[in-house]
């Protein structure tokens, strides 16, 4: 079979596993067609009980040696709890398996065999045959690491909550997609699963993945974003994907739009953003309050800071947890460096000089402000360069068209804000430029390291090679870069924008890194 894998699963040759399948196959509904399952019994609490402490990780730093730069000092990693189980992965494939995940069971007194079992083929999950057809058609041959660990936990019965943290581009979307497709009953024409995303761009992408994997099923999807639905029309699709505000509006309108009592699964993609961001967080919690207490809550993100983790534990009580070791949050395949400039003007001149590198594949340039994104795009276009700008002030239809054009390769360089910093998957992106260092906003002190991780995660996805360049121009931005290096324990090569030799070396290094082996 010609492999059309888009990176959601590994492409290594499938291997058989000697262990029996876990007790995780979905239970058939009364229709006995292999779809859906009986509604789980309601928990004793109201969904807001305190959960266990958040999980940490430890391990050695792995420097790829691309640049001869000293490794900055890093803080001592947190002490691992006795209840953490370290899982190794020996498979090979598209995704470079250099990181480790830790699985924390919600109930350590239960049978450890099923939750700890890691499948090595999709067949071991006892999925419906129509889902297996979709997996094959999508080019999957073998689960990625996060899928291997998460799917047995997600599909086990009775359903359990799950909090999953794994680096960008490792297949989280396909994992929760298979769970939703397995939990809903296609013979019932009403929403039974909801997936919340922080942006319309990410919501549209998630719908595409669900439609691709579920193409041989009778499961329908509905995109719940501003302007996508008539306020008086009833939703007859089984899976809703959308942004918080629109979903709250739908749920508040009651049974004439959809029946909240039928919802079985609630998924938060980029959960830390949904929980922490003012406005989005309130709407996300409102959605939870409008749903039955026995809904399976599934939270996924590439990052979870301690504060967000505390809220996640309350949002998804007694959840199974899958975490990356903290020092493995960034991807080794991404070559990180920073360009030292003297002024804002020199930053633009350096970006313009690097245009030939930006179009080797595709590139995303992240700015702090919308006006900056537009200004840079206008200047580059006036100089004859083909670029586009994208941010939240543009009309919805225009945003969709711009991102579709970039995804299809019509545009090589996209100048944008954080609107696509999270979750967006465009495999051809092999370079990310942080034109402005992400900061914590008004009242914040220092760089927003989580946003930095998400930004550079737009490249180097699914084990592909990629480069990240961050621009500095004053004391604060240089200090912020030092803090990023110290926190991540990842060295960056300094390039002097004033040096013609350095710029030439940078161009050669970038071209070599993006064309040669990672």
Curated annotation (Swiss-Prot):
Composition bias type Low complexity, residue spans: 44-53
Per UniProt, subcellular location reads as: Cytoplasm; Nucleus, Nuclear pore complex; Nucleus membrane
Q: Where is this region: Disordered?
A: 1-85
Question: What biological-process GO terms show up in the record?
Answer: poly(A)+ mRNA export from nucleus; protein transport; translational termination; tRNA export from nucleus
* Membrane topology, as annotated: Peripheral membrane protein
Catalytic reactions of this protein: ATP + H2O = ADP + phosphate + H(+)
Major place of residence: cytoplasm
Q: Name one Pfam family in it.
A: Helicase_C
| Alphabetically ordered keywords of this record | ATP-binding, Cytoplasm, Helicase, Hydrolase, Membrane, mRNA transport, Nuclear pore complex, Nucleotide-binding, Nucleus, Protein transport, RNA-binding, Translocation, Transport
Q: Where does ATP bind?
A: 166-173
Q: Where is the Helicase C-terminal domain?
A: 333-503
Identify the residue span(s) of motif Q motif: 120-148
Q: What is the protein's known function?
A: ATP-dependent RNA helicase associated with the nuclear pore complex and essential for mRNA export from the nucleus. May participate in a terminal step of mRNA export through the removal of proteins that accompany mRNA through the nucleopore complex. May also be involved in early transcription.
**A GO molecular function for this record?**
RNA helicase activity
Q: What is its EC number?
A: 3.6.4.13
Disulfide pairs here are: none
Motif (DEAD box) on chain: 269-272
The Helicase ATP-binding domain is annotated at: 153-322
Output the Gene Ontology cellular-component terms: cellular bud tip; cytoplasmic stress granule; nuclear membrane; nuclear pore cytoplasmic filaments; nucleus
- Show the domain comment: The Q motif is unique to and characteristic of the DEAD box family of RNA helicases and controls ATP binding and hydrolysis.
Broad enzyme group? hydrolase
Q: What is this protein called?
A: ATP-dependent RNA helicase DBP5
